Amino acid sequence: MQEQYRPEEIESKVQLHWDEKRTFEVTEDESKEKYYCLSMLPYPSGRLHMGHVRNYTIGDVIARYQRMLGKNVLQPIGWDAFGLPAEGAAVKNNTAPAPWTYDNIAYMKNQLKMLGFGYDWSRELATCTPEYYRWEQKFFTELYKKGLVYKKTSAVNWCPNDQTVLANEQVIDGCCWRCDTKVERKEIPQWFIKITAYADELLNDLDKLDHWPDTVKTMQRNWIGRSEGVEITFNVNDYDNTLTVYTTRPDTFMGCTYLAVAAGHPLAQKAAENNPELAAFIDECRNTKVAEAEMATMEKKGVDTGFKAVHPLTGEEIPVWAANFVLMEYGTGAVMAVPGHDQRDYEFASKYGLNIKPVILAADGSEPDLSQQALTEKGVLFNSGEFNGLDHEAAFNAIADKLTAMGVGERKVNYRLRDWGVSRQRYWGAPIPMVTLEDGTVMPTPDDQLPVILPEDVVMDGITSPIKADPEWAKTTVNGMPALRETDTFDTFMESSWYYARYTCPEYKEGMLDSEAANYWLPVDIYIGGIEHAIMHLLYFRFFHKLMRDAGMVNSDEPAKQLLCQGMVLADAFYYVGENGERNWVSPVDAIVERDEKGRIVKAKDAAGHELVYTGMSKMSKSKNNGIDPQVMVERYGADTVRLFMMFASPADMTLEWQESGVEGANRFLKRVWKLVYEHTAKGDVAALNVDALTEDQKALRRDVHKTIAKVTDDIGRRQTFNTAIAAIMELMNKLAKAPTDGEQDRALMQEALLAVVRMLNPFTPHICFTLWQELKGEGDIDNAPWPVADEKAMVEDSTLVVVQVNGKVRAKITVPVDATEEQVRERAGQEHLVAKYLDGVTVRKVIYVPGKLLNLVVG
């Protein structure tokens, strides 16, 4: 064994061994308990970043640990390979998205191997290949036949200059990112999947997910947004149709003083025919993209349509306004306004001088003061005719019942969740498998024409999708009739909604899933990824699983038993102010810093001499130029060091602060482990350990070894506090480094301890452990070695520490045998000088003894 720890030599050798032996390839095995460990698959952007490394290290630690417990562990990896960034990169680099993507995959695959992750590479998949997306296309046609897919018009961002649809992130300050033309909102037909048909199940089954973070479940509950309320119909004077609104507060209905409709509502459109002000307002709304997050903060505007609706219970006429805070795609595109008891309605009514009518008493029973704001709390009704004096619940039911009896109301359950729009007017995605026949009939692409292959050899102009620009691509024949293919592609969330299931049978040719393999491996035992995916991906992931279950492919209700959301990776961020006042961000690698005695940064400059402003730790990002390249760190310290630091520096679900000093510390620790094994093995063969012949000191050291095994097992397996597991191993290493190694049993005990340490470290630092296991002559490869088991007998304490008090004040701490009697403890306490001096010449009036813990002598 060489004396120096040289990761650059051992890591590549061990990785080659894993490749040649196919160590981590697995198949279904009914005789073994399975464990499916999955990290969210990466987008092949070109290089791994530290966020990836953290995510995949956590997954690999768990997978290797479970493997050592004797389970059949599946840990696959693949590539979420479709998406908009590839189009931009292709234009910039004068290539096509496909070669750019495949080059990135090859590069990043090598980076993953360099980090030593134990993946089953035989199951690797890329979502941009027809072998993958053909099954997604087939599944979509099946959903269409079941009535779970439909087409309707929906608003998109449209650049009139480029004649193209823009993704939200391509709209900068209301203008096209490419040509700076003002972006318009345009209604175009798009495909939707009915996720709302599963809303109740998606909501209720959150209660089954005991091992998902509460934050994620709460976010999904709010996103689904189930509410119970009443749908109310209003007659409108001089208008052919009625208006329908939905409210969760029918108890406030007697305070409804106006209605508001979306700018795109047919009533607003009709009113605009003779109202230029309204027509201009509708135009303004049409070209304003409004995300829900912006709705709360934007200025509320509106125009009176001139129409009057009739309040069904009071018979009063109330005005109908067009307002920018009502969206056509939400609910009915019309809302009732109760400005006395809703703050948004209050602000709008105050701005435009509309009637504000209070109908709920304040908590003290007085009439509410509405001079500054609405009263939004629930309470007792007044000013409400026959409903006066009713509390919230009674009023809700009474008003709902009356409206229902009159035929103008109906109790309804509503959801905030909208159906999933899966059409994207982009090129680099899976083609949507639908066709339109010459006679206008729309139908799914027949099975014998699947997959609809996306051509990869294309020229990108950065404006129009190549499959939209080429009229020939869309032409096909169905049932002998000319037809045109759909030229939109799927939302890339489609591919990432079912990849986890395809990993169980990536070569299967007969269908989307081989049910036998899928049901052996599924559900996923632990799924690891960022909390930013809480509502979109993780909701679609759950939805798709239920769709596949209902298609008979899987027999579980949920895709993953446990979800672990790893924290972000932070790094120092620095900038200097340029000549034009702009911020120039400088990589922390290039910052020369001065620190105070507490290690805090007090001054910084770069190599060019710029004084740098230190903004603290923030998420590693391109915008702040504070990302640290994992590859550079692996080349400098080795993969094991980077992995160990990642798992030690912070709990897995908390933010991690990147500190190179911490990386150096992890590296020093691994050098110490190497040195101890080197010194131990240099002394030659080791005798067998005789546990019955150990001295007290040897027993104490062996007790520490086995207590550490017990703690590390609990920390990794149950608590998933990996940082405390590593801390416990480090503490044990400090004791081993000081332990005597001269005697035969000293060395036998050291052998037992080092074999345990190397196995406990193996999930974290597999390359060094693989090598040290061989040097220690462990049995077989460490990858097939069992996890160490704590010896209960070894952990039993022979002695215990008893606190001795005189009149309640601590005077000594004594070590006594665990089976010592009260008399023996008193006798031993009396031998302590500090106790004896307080007992001299006094009478012991009372003795309080808590066996093995406390002796209190009361004297007087």
Swiss-Prot record:
Motif ('HIGH' region): 42-52
Gene Ontology terms for molecular function: aminoacyl-tRNA deacylase activity; ATP binding; leucine-tRNA ligase activity
GO CC list: cytosol
GO biological process, one term: leucyl-tRNA aminoacylation
Subcellular location as annotated: Cytoplasm
Catalyses which reaction(s): tRNA(Leu) + L-leucine + ATP = L-leucyl-tRNA(Leu) + AMP + diphosphate
PROSITE patterns: AA_TRNA_LIGASE_I
Keyword Lipid biosynthesis in record: no
InterPro entries documented for this protein: aa-tRNA-synth_I_CS (IPR001412), aa-tRNA-synth_Ia (IPR002300), Leu-tRNA-ligase (IPR002302), Leu_tRNA-synth_edit (IPR025709), M/V/L/I-tRNA-synth_anticd-bd (IPR013155), Methionyl/Leucyl_tRNA_Synth (IPR015413), Rossmann-like_a/b/a_fold (IPR014729), tRNAsynth_Ia_anticodon-bd (IPR009080)
UniProt-listed Enzyme Commission number(s): 6.1.1.4
HAMAP family associated with the record: Leu_tRNA_synth_B
Record-given protein name: Leucine--tRNA ligase
Species in which this protein is naturally found: Escherichia coli (strain 55989 / EAEC)
